[in-house]
Amino acid sequence: MKTLLKTFLCLLLSTAIAKADGFKGHVYDQKTGEPLIGVTVLLEQTKAVALTGLDGSFEFKKTTPGQYTLVISHLTYKTLTQQITVLEKDNAPVNIYLSERNSKNLSEVVVAANTKASSEKTARKLEQKSAQVMNVVSGQAIEVSPDLTVANVIQRISGVSVERSSNGDGQYAILRGMDKRYNYTLINGVKIPSPDNKYRYVPLDIFPSELLDRLEVYKSLTPNMEGDAIGGAVNMVMKDAPNKLLLNANVATGYSQMVLDKGFTAFDAGGINSKSPYEAHGKNYDAGPKDFATGTLNYHNKNFAPNMVAGLSVGQRFLNDKLGIILAGSFQNNYRSTTSTFYNSSVVETDKYAVITSMVNRQYSEQQQRSGFHGKVDYAFNENNKLSLYSVYMNLQNLQTREGINTNFSNADYNGPAGNAQLSYESRSRKINQQIYNSTLHGDHKIIPGKLKLDWSAVFSSARNEVPDNTTIKLNGIRKNFEETPTTVSGSNRRWERNTDNDIAGYANLTYTAKIAGTKVDFTAGGLYRDKQRSSFFNNYVLKAVNTYGMYGVDFNDYTEIEWDVQNPKGAVANALTYDASEKTTAGYGMFKFKAAELEVTGGVRVEHTNQGYHMLFPRGESRPVGSQIYTDVLPSLNLKYEVAEHQNIRGSYFRSLNRPGFFEIVPGPIVQEEYQERGNPDLKRAIADNLDLRYELFPNHSDQLLVGVFYKRIQDPIENTIKADATRPQDVYYSAGNFGTARNYGLEIDYIKFFSKIGIKTNYTYTNSSITTDKSSRIRDEKGDLRTILVTQTRPLYGQSAHIGNLSLLYKDSNKGWDAQLAAAYTGPRINTVSQFVDNDLWQKGFVQMDLSIEKRIRNHFSIYAKAGNLLNTPTEIFIKGTNSKNADLPGQGEANETLIRKDYYKQTYLLGVRYKL
């Protein structure tokens, strides 16, 4: 790791200390004046060649005085020949301006357009010319970044942080401090469903980043966009067919440092039964021990666990460029290990802060197999009519073992100094398979060229989540004189879960262009209809050892030797997670857009009608086993853009948006999780927000930018998950969603990108401030001395919001020698991880810095080698309570002043070395 860092720093320093004895120059676009990257500059007399850097600059060193001919060439520009005179010293910079190739050569023009689709120049142009507030990460930037998934890429954008998964990688996006529930995800502008069994949000770690042309984040909405995005919307623009043959391939391998240090524990996933005995044999079947495979109990160490990444993209246009085809695929197989310490806690008596009751030391071993495939066929019948068919399939398989030792602090056997405690051992083997599929037939038609056009989409999407035979086994144990020993079997659970989400949708947009008072005005009307059908299934079997007194090491040596008895032979399908849900969304909108002088105006109104319902298949006395929510929302919006100068904008926008409840969130039954109980809330309402944005934009050239913006959100009935007490049994608590009055969220965003000759800087900073006031529990003694729980109000930030977020990336590019390097750091400030039932006992996640590195070297022809390293600083995830209880003072790991540690996870570094081919 130190060697990689030294190499990167040496690359940076070499630029600073190099001396120039010859002459320098810049190459610009003749029309826009923007610097051009990657232009070939040939010094004809000496055959020396230079490529322009990140700021369009080039340099020739040790050039003897005299007359020279420069030949300047680029794929998308006309080749230019220019005569220059080189003096002994004090040579003035040579400024060269290139014009684009002749537009009559349609092939080259289309190539240029497609070549630029994933470029930094295109990304900056989209941000500048867009009708709304947005940020873009180009495919070019993604390729040279350390990030392998979209979830990790998106954290580089201002105002965006990520929620990590159990292996330390990013998983969900948090936009502008608004929890993951407040944004939606698009592929090529089409909303996709979520594989989650309860909620709507899409895990972004399922998407390999190499399949993208660019990643767009919309921070304000226009009327032609769906309205359920208070935080914003994420759009993945996938690779499109180029004009000439595209052939890109890469393969890489690497390792996780934690796997090297701790090893990797695996189980036999091949024998897992995809269906529970209830499904396989019918509802009246009594399951026995032989119905449960032993593979999930067969743990073994894996001595060789390398990571592997591979990708392939092939595309071209045919039939005089009328037919375009592209196919792309990506496969990633990663092994990760995590070391975790978790503390269970409880607020007792009148204590202000929680008391730690037990500590669990866990070791995770996780194998992730991520595959993605997409293809697109488009055909242009003529210049006025075009059809395309796009399909994408994403699959993420996660095989995880989790082994834990629980130390009970509340038991009388606990004596820390003597090394005595009551223990419990828990092992869990789990397979999760998530899939997302989308197929979109799209048409573009110019009915009256220049006057009337129509575009439409017919969409089928599906998402699936399967967790078959999730196996947990528990043993009792004891620690005596610091020696830990498993003893007898406590029990086992075998759980099956699955859910499917199928969407059929249609979109249509009709645009009429008219001139009013000499100004061109676009009037657009359109609509959407989506029919969503969701099903969810849950079943759980409880197993008990036949020999309840059997001792580990005497009667059995591993889990496969235990004889089991099934306590509930028919299973437990009567659960709130066994339900059907549906949602029918109908929307229509009217939008206008015009530009008068320097002012561009885009506005209109959208109306969305929602019919969301659920049906519990096995109710257990709930008062509303079947229910629905029907409502209509009117969502106006207005986006203003004023061009202060050619490369400067001031934007202002207003839009109203909503956030619908998740599918399970309105199902009234309870489910029992490992550490808490969870319940739905059929009275949960949608949240409505009014959103304001103001942003100043400066684009001095095609690669540099300065963006300074502020935003304000007023959210009615925001949805927050909190821990609540049962109304009839206050000692029982559960986790549930609720609406909490009115919340306010405002902030500041700054983006800055600057490229010098070979060095570039990308940095952004976001400040976010929100407040929401909710009821919290507090315990007191009344006048009789009896313990009583009262409600008090407390104001806090929104769940998941960090006040401070920042990114800094240092880039190095030497086109002549074929070097690309990037050192990227992302800071996420403290944020609430879990909202507590009790006042002052919310769980917070500590602020953290994640640093990653990537280096690439072109070696010959179309080949390059690259290296990527993640989590260089071994940044942990730390969860804590802002306060301490004196009763926790002598417990292990509780040494921080004014903090109660609840969880601490370490992941260590990951390394990857690969080869890339680009035709």
Predicted regions located by residue number:
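Transmembrane beta-barrel wall of Gram-negative outer-membrane proteins
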Residues: 22, 293-402, 638
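Short, acidic, small-residue-rich periplasmic hinge/interaction motif at the N-terminus
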Residues: 40-44, 73-75, 87, 91-143, ...
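Short acidic/polar hinge/loop motifs at secondary-structure boundaries
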Residues: 61, 162, 190-219, 239, ...
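Surface-exposed extracellular loop regions of Gram-negative outer-membrane beta-barrel proteins
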Residues: 191, 533, 557-570, 611, ...
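Outer-membrane beta-barrel signature, preferentially recognizing the C-terminal barrel domain
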Residues: 418-442, 573-586, 629, 658-715, ...
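Gram-negative outer-membrane beta-barrel transporters
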Residues: 712-714, 732, 736-835
